[in-house]
Regions:
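Class I SAM-dependent methyltransferase SAM/SAH-binding core
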Residues: 61, 67-116
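Conserved class I S-adenosyl-L-methionine
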Residues: 2-54, 155-179
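A short glycine-rich, Lys/Arg-flanked "PGG" loop and its adjoining helix->strand segment in the class I
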Residues: 140-152
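A short acidic, Gly/Pro-enriched loop at the edge of an enzyme's catalytic core
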Residues: 115-126
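A short SAM/SAH-binding and catalytic strip from SAM-dependent methyltransferases
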Residues: 126-137
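A C-terminal cap/extension of S-adenosyl-L-methionine-dependent methyltransferases
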Residues: 101, 178, 200, 204, ...
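Acceptor-substrate binding/catalytic loop of class I
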Residues: 160, 180-197
Length: 253
């Protein structure tokens, strides 16, 4: 279990530079390169709002925010959001989109490494990390940094990909190889995170895991495969099935 807390980057084939090339296509909702994130966003945001509690006026950090899809939605729901990411071009797209919308005064972005967050201890009421932990070799250090900047009594909410055979088949075999909705090497199975491993990382950082739940597409799997190939016209739901993706939250005493 402890091996996943810090994986040698030289052993993985993940290529996060893909995100630098997306540009304003971050906001193409149906057939764009991150259409899957848009499809999952309503369910993710709804779950996060539920476990975080009322968002109005609360400071929230989005770690690994990319083009700002989740950050903007949580700002729209009332949070005062700061999003961080290492992809400068993704942040530029996030800023352009935010500047043209109703949330421009309640969301801001900064280029930062999640392993060395540029914030003082106990800076945020809440933290979210969505579709990010499965890209981080040093999971333990990343979680410790998030715990450091979270206020006592705060909540860290997350979603990520489980390290199972089924997740490897669907995320890499189907999405990257078969239907090519995700570029090759966007993911590496060795960086997928089992719930027990994340629980260990959270505990070591002084956070208490409260729950994990599944995040799954609704409908028939074969019909969903056709929908994905045509443009990711899917709906997602919080379920009991954590075999592929799961979300959850932890608290800081």
């Amino acid at each position: 279990m402890s091996g996943r807390l810090s994986v040698d980057p030289a052993r993985v084939t993940i290529d996060n530079r893909y995100y630098d090339d997306i540009g304003d296509a971050w906001w193409q909702t149906r057939k764009g390169p991150v259409a899957g994130l848009h499809a999952m966003n309503p369910t993710r945001a709804g779950y996060f709002e539920k476990v975080l509690g009322p968002l109005k006026g609360r400071t929230l950090l989005d770690v690994g925010c990319g083009g700002g899809i989740l950050a903007e939605e949580l700002a729209r729901r009332g949070a005062d959001v700061t999003g961080i990411d290492m992809s400068v071009s993704s942040l530029a797209a996030a800023n352009r989109h935010a500047a043209a919308g109703a949330t421009r005064d309640s969301v801001r972005y900064a280029a930062s490494d999640a392993l060395a967050l540029p914030f003082a201890d106990a800076s945020f009421d809440a933290i979210v990390s969505s579709d990010f932990l499965e890209h981080v070799p040093d999971l333990g250090r990343c979680v410790r940094e998030m715990a450091r900047v979270l206020k006592p009594g705060g909540v860290l909410a997350f979603d990520t990909i489980n390290r199972t055979f089924l997740a490897w088949v669907i995320v890499i075999g189907v999405m990257e190889v078969l239907v090519r909705r995700i570029p090759r090497h966007t993911h590496d199975r060795r960086l997928f995170v089992k719930p027990s491993e994340l629980a260990s990382a959270l505990s070591a950082a002084g956070l208490a895991l409260v729950e994990t739940r599944g995040l799954s597409p609704e409908g028939n799997p074969l019909a969903n495969l056709v929908r994905v190939a045509r443009g990711f016209d899917l709906r997602f739901a919080v379920t009991s099935d954590q075999n592929v993706s799961y979300l959850g939250y932890a608290t800081k005493a």
